[in-house]
A protein has these predicted regions:
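N-terminal, active-site-proximal structural segment of metallo-dependent hydrolase catalytic domains
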Residues: 2-158, 358-361
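Conserved beta-strand segments of alpha/beta enzyme cores
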Residues: 115, 163-165, 209, 292-293, ...
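A solvent-exposed, charged loop/short amphipathic helix patch at secondary-structure junctions
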Residues: 224-243
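Short, glycine/charged-enriched secondary-structure capping and boundary segments
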Residues: 130-133, 157-160, 225-226, 284-288, ...
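Structural signal for conserved beta-strand scaffold positions within catalytic alpha/beta enzyme cores
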Residues: 118, 168, 212, 293-296
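Active-site beta-strand/loop signature of hydrolases that rely on acidic residues for catalysis
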Residues: 50, 115-121, 131-154, 176, ...
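Structured beta-strand-rich core segments of catalytic domains in phosphoester-bond hydrolases
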Residues: 89-109, 123, 127, 142, ...
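Metal-dependent phosphoester-hydrolase catalytic domains
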Residues: 12-71, 78-81, 200, 258-270, ...
Length: 361
């Protein structure tokens, strides 16, 4: 056979081998990322990077390879399709709502339900009017805000809820349709700050406890892992500093959980706020044990809440992680939950409707 003809005949096979090899590599990359994300998580600094990075970026190799594979090799297209599915569903934490079942206990208290809205308002900027309009649209009974110092509260917020019970403490702002008062503050030594405030609310069905939470962001630790630092002579020091910040964050989370347990005393309790921690984090289950996450139980889709500003590689208005949560103890059924769609703050709000299934004490 003519050598040139033989070479031309082998060219398609070479391309096929290359595309298959790259497709397997892309699938392996996604699998390794998932193992790092869910198996390692914040137990190691590289897992923490995976936890707080925009996970959609992991799709890049498969998104490039898929259209090529569709023309050259269907098996390779299948591999890339599987990789895309794994990222879109598992890595990005897509949720389907679980069926709601009303309980016999709920009828004992007349099916008392309420709507709660929680959100970090970034000191009432950059577009609090949009955020406030979204709050109003949910028709809430309770509002729990973070990074909301009372001294900077806009007149529009005060006017909107002038006939409500308002409770403030450091950065926390709570509004209730029902009588409410502060029970205690959770001051943590890890960052020398208030990380939560507990409010007792007298509802028509009895008293309940709302804990408004704002724990430390991982961002300051991740700043230490800039490539210029990590791949320098000071790399080990940068990693050690990041791990120290992470350890203090986890200590703060544990302190807030101890605070919640002490305050609630088995009463009907809702814990809401900016946890700066996603459910996929290895630190989150230790905090949320015994509580149900409203979005996980009844939310639809991704529900990403942060960051909405231009602090990361994605454009403003495209959050990639869900770090704002509403948790309830066993006294409640979750009717529905959703996250906001506006970009009035650097976080989107979370709204949940919950129904009391045990008489409040």
């Amino acid at each position: 056979m003519n050598p040139s003809i033989q070479q031309n005949a082998s060219e398609p096979r070479r391309k096929l081998r290359v595309i298959r090899l790259l497709s397997w590599a892309a699938l392996g990359w996604v699998t390794a990322f998932l193992l790092l994300l869910f198996g390692v998580s914040e137990r190691w600094w590289l897992g923490a990077v995976a936890t707080y990075s925009p996970r959609i970026a992991v799709l890049a190799p498969s998104l490039v390879l898929l259209p090529i594979a569709l023309f050259l090799d269907r098996r390779s297209a299948y591999l890339n399709g599987v990789a895309i599915f794994m990222v879109a569903v598992f890595a990005m934490e897509f949720h389907l709502p679980k069926p709601f079942r009303s309980s016999a206990e709920g009828s004992k208290v007349g099916g008392f339900s309420l709507r709660i809205v929680s959100g970090n308002v970034d000191s009432f900027g950059p577009d609090f009017e949009t955020f406030l309009n979204e709050i109003k649209g949910t028709e809430p009974d309770l509002i729990a805000l973070q990074e909301a110092p009372a001294g900077r509260a806009p007149l529009a917020l005060k006017d909107a809820y002038s006939d409500w019970q308002i409770v403030t403490s450091t950065e926390f702002w709570v509004a209730s349709r029902f009588p409410a008062h502060i029970l205690d503050r959770c001051h943590t030594t890890d960052f020398n700050r208030d990380a939560a405030v507990a409010v007792e609310i007298d509802t028509p069905a009895g008293t309940m406890v709302l804990v408004d939470v704002h724990t430390r962001t991982a961002r300051f630790g991740l700043y230490e892992l800039q490539p210029a630092k990590v791949f320098s002579r000071e790399g080990s020091k940068a990693i050690a500093k990041m791990e120290d910040i992470q350890a203090r964050r986890h200590s703060e989370l544990a302190a807030v959980r101890e605070f919640v347990d002490r305050i609630s005393r088995e009463r009907a309790t809702i814990v809401a706020g900016d946890f700066n921690t996603p459910e996929s984090s290895s630190a989150f289950p230790e905090f949320s044990g015994g509580f149900t996450n409203a979005f996980t139980a009844s939310g639809w889709g991704y529900g990403h809440t942060a960051p909405c500003d231009r602090t990361g590689p994605l454009p403003a208005g495209h959050p990639w992680i869900r770090v704002d949560h509403i948790l309830v103890n066993r006294s409640w059924d979750i009717v529905s939950c959703r996250t906001g769609t506006g970009n009035g703050s650097d976080h989107r709000l979370v709204m949940a409707e919950v129904r009391l299934k045990e008489p409040a004490r």
